[in-house]
Amino acid sequence: MDKPLALGKIQGNIIGGFNKDYETFLFLNVLDAGKARGYLDEIKNEIATSEEVLAFNRLFKQLRKRHGGELGILKATWTNIAFSAAGLDALKIKDLSKFPKEFTDGMAARKKMIGDLGESDPSNWIGPLGSKQVHAVLIVAADSQSDLYQQVTRYEEALTACGGFSIVFRQEGAVRMDDPGHEHFGFKDGVSQPGIRGVDKPTGEDPDQGNPGQDLLHAGEFVLGYATQTHDEKPGHDGPNPDPGPISENGPAWTENGSYMVFRRLAQDVEGFHNHVKNKAAELGMTPELLGAKLVGRFASGCPLEKMKPESNG
């Protein structure tokens, strides 16, 4: 039996995605540890919890279904914060040796293993992203551009005034307004998320499945301090072993209920992808829609590949 998730101590967007149309990422450098820690103490209650975000998302879905739309029915602006190993060191945090090497080294130092070579070399990354100067990332997500601007402006002014941080890079994000709910290659987004035991409930007869085709996994795969998956197959069971595995403990004891975030800024060649799919599909004697589904793992509509129904695409 898995222990209950302390959702009030887990940051929102770890369990329970923000699911907002607009986001800003503020990349921070620590100038003064004491002042920086003082400011973090001031805003700690502004950091969203998974408990809050999950409750909001459930209510939002209920109201959208009831009203037949989502315009203006319910709004919230969320904040999340993450720290790099260099940032924790700059904040005078102890026990850094207990973190995994992958975290303390950082992506730039592991470029050969990751494949960040040639044009993708960290020396070519925009701004300070390939250096150790990024100490923290403050993520703000909102339903409207105006709500986002208001909150981000407040943080920018406060960060400057506190004297503990400098803002070294800013990344804006927004959903596609021309094709809502779809990523840039045209495929429905957000449909490949695993289910989490203790959060997502079975919707059918199989107790190990959330939504149809969605395996329920132990929370320790995503959050520190909880049971992980066991890699041994369970005789007579189809799918991931439902029995809990070892507790995830990749860090000091105080990291319980925390997680690891990876920020990757990628260039996507949308035209190149579609041209390749079109040409290769002709060689293979299949439609571009089917080949695209085979490459991505689902049709553009989000229809599972197992259905093998190109006409479901759209």
Indicate where each model-derived feature is located:
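Long, low-complexity, Ser/Thr/Gly/Pro-rich intrinsically disordered segments that act as flexible linkers
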Residues: 1-314
